[in-house]
A protein has these predicted regions:
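Short acidic capping loops at alpha-helix termini that bridge into adjacent secondary structure
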Residues: 100-104
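N-terminal presequence-like segments and the immediate start of the first folded domain
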Residues: 2-84, 95-97, 112-157
Length: 157
């Protein structure tokens, strides 16, 4: 009986090590790991005092990440006009990357007033092809430059 308890203790003591070793061993088999490189798609980035804050868009492997686009200096018009403007900007960024609106996988929409949800949807409708991407829409207290809407997305090439 004492020998059985000792064996169980040794086994249980080894379980955490196996949990760590198994995934590492599995990585060594099969296809080689993907090279972790990304490509900035535009040379300009938002900077403050010479320090880069973010990239407007970049690609990583076969994915394209487009950072939040707002109506910006063109922040005129109602929610429908601003949403169209923002989606046009996103479409330009995706084309630059070699992707398109129908290849978008995930969208985040930020509205300064949830009452604008229906108006935003009217401009959003049919912009992403036959199979629209998954989407999250949240209301926020404010957006830069007086924009009523900001949208970011992830697409594939």
């Amino acid at each position: 009986m004492a020998r059985m308890k000792s064996s169980r203790r040794k086994f249980l003591a080894a379980v955490p090590a196996l949990a760590v070793a198994a995934p590492v061993a599995a990585q060594g088999q099969g296809a080689p790991a993907a090279k972790k490189t990304y490509r900035k798609l535009t040379p300009t980035s938002m900077t403050v005092k010479g320090q880069q804050l973010y990239s407007p868009e970049l690609s990583f492997g076969n994915l394209v990440f487009v950072s939040g686009k707002g109506a910006g200096v063109k922040a005129t018009g109602d929610i429908q006009a601003q949403t169209k403007n923002v989606l046009d900007q996103i479409e330009e960024s995706l084309k630059l990357a070699g992707s398109s609106m129908d290849k978008v996988l995930k969208v985040n929409v930020y509205l300064t007033d949830i009452k604008n949800f229906e108006g935003m949807n009217q401009s959003y409708l049919n912009r992403f092809g036959a199979e629209p991407p998954v989407r999250t829409t949240v209301a926020v207290t404010a957006l830069p430059d007086g924009s009523l809407v900001e949208i970011d997305c992830i697409a594939h090439l």
